[in-house]
Amino acid sequence: MKNITIAIDAMGGDHGLEIVIPACIRAIKNNPDLKLLLVGVQDKISASLKKHGMLSCQQFTIVHASEVVTMDELPSHALRNKKDSSMRIAINLVKEGRAQACVSAGNTGALMATARYVLKTLPGIDRPAIVSELPTMGGKTRVIDLGANVDSCAEHLFQFAVMGSALIQAIENKPKPKIGLLNIGVEEIKGNDQVKRTAHMLAECSVMNYVGYVEGDHFYSGDVDLVVCDGFVGNVALKASEGLAKLLLTVLKESFSRNWLTKIAGLIALPALKHLKNRLDPSRYNGASLLGLNGIVVKSHGGANEVGFQHAIEQAVLEVKNNVVDLVRDQINDFINQGLLL
């Protein structure tokens, strides 16, 4: 597929243009056929592009937006009062067909509310969910939901499993992804009513490859392709994982800097340490998909660096290339036709 066009919320996130523009430059250098619609305050975007010597780059088009959704703004306020925000216009571009996907590092609640209002959910899906990948011993696994829904009933968790499974089939070409349901133990007697009901629904669905309960340490074992949980638990687990990765890398750096002997040992171990850093660096896994919408929306971490935001753009490109929305829609329609979804 050529001439992929992505709408970028250039003003969103903790750092805005300071991170977004350099990340976009990195992305177009890796993707010569990629066009980016930079949505935000025109004068500020132009000045930033000029600063980086990219003002005349044909792969960039500036789309003016006069407003910005702040990181602490209520989603309802942003939805009602920020109709000319960079976030809103970027999502509108997807609805209008001018862009095939949208990427934003902005306010998660506002992004979810706005995307749901503008793009609407797919038939059979009550609520969109956030899914992203985590590193494992054997490669990576995906977790859904990561914060879109703090309270989810069994029916919603079942829908998340359907969508997450379809995403993995589309991107990784795995016909039967292994699905695990996050719980406080692997025994059938463990868990609350919500989790037990979800487990029963998944076990009764022969179409999906449900392998049973998984505990928190299974996030990193690589035993399953998809971990299903509600957004409250998923978000806490994600943030804890990011914090642990940063702690580990910091402790290693300090340990090899203690004296001249440890510094020599560090030089000897440098190739292995670089490999470890690449495996654990949270920025390499940045870019969470908002599944269940009539369009591709990718959420970047608000505090992401250049590499992290670039990875979010790459995730959007990957989903466009693999026709993720169409494949998820087809999977959902199959479930509806079989009476597995309403």
From Swiss-Prot:
Catalytic activity from the UniProt record: a fatty acyl-[ACP] + phosphate = an acyl phosphate + holo-[ACP]
One Pfam family this sequence matches: FA_synthesis
EC number: 2.3.1.274
Keywords associated with the record: Cytoplasm, Lipid biosynthesis, Lipid metabolism, Phospholipid biosynthesis, Phospholipid metabolism, Transferase
Similarity comment text for this entry: Belongs to the PlsX family.
Name of protein: Phosphate acyltransferase
Class of the enzyme per the UniProt entry, highest EC level: transferase
Single GO MF annotation: phosphate:acyl-[acyl carrier protein] acyltransferase activity
Pathway(s) annotated for this protein in UniProt: Lipid metabolism; phospholipid metabolism
Example of a GO biological process term: phospholipid biosynthetic process
